[in-house]
Amino acid sequence: KSPEALEEILWESFFADLHNDNIENILPENTQNKEFSQFYFQHINKLLLARSSKRYVTKANYNITRLHYLLKLNNSSKAIIMVRDPVSHINSIVRQDRIFSESHRKNPKTKHFMHMSGHYEFGLDKKLINIDVEKFTKIQKQFNTGNDIKAWAMYWSMVYNYAKSLIEQLPKSNVMLCRYEDLCNDPKNFFCQSILFFCPLFLVGLHI
């Protein structure tokens, strides 16, 4: 199970079009929203104080399209992008989408809860990240004609091509690409040799 920070509720409160799939959902570096930046850091500081912690970690898939903006807000931020073998990843996504869609059919309240918590990745009313309008239109066409597997494959390609561009554009001290399979095969070694030093968590006294 993956813990969710439920950060998306905050983002949606300050950016109205984050999940408008008719436009690109990317927040560029020149994004201006003083109210959000003030509230966001107040929120983080509140959590750190409440938990007597020094570092804040969030698991948020949508933030991949906000990294330029987030790094402008805090240039010491670290982003870890996980990439998984496309065949197994797409198979997993298709399975999850079917599970959530069936849940929404049986109990519409589950769909409402997902929307309230800022999750639109799966289910009957999914809203995917629009990174490129032309590509996204073709993806939607595949979904509309029932070609879900092809649609998800095209979506995977769009998202991870964008991730590749981020790795090339952003400082290596801020963004790291990690293979999901490496983490699964040897989690302790992977964490110690990669994530621990990249963040760097050893500075806050974390021991494994």
Description of each model-found segment:
Residues 64-65, 88, 185:
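Short alpha-helical
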Residues 1-56:
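PAPS-dependent sulfation machinery
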Residues 101-208:
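PAPS-dependent sulfotransferases, especially Golgi type II membrane carbohydrate sulfotransferases
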Residues 59-61, 70-95:
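Conserved phosphate-donor/acceptor-positioning beta-strand/loop module used by diverse small-molecule
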Residues 55-59, 177-179:
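Short catalytic-loop micro-motif centered on adjacent basic/acidic residues
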Residues 48, 71, 167-171:
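N-terminal cationic-hydrophobic initiation segments that often serve targeting/anchoring roles
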Residues 57-60, 86, 93, 149-156, ...:
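Active-site glycine/GP-rich loop and adjacent strand/helix microenvironment
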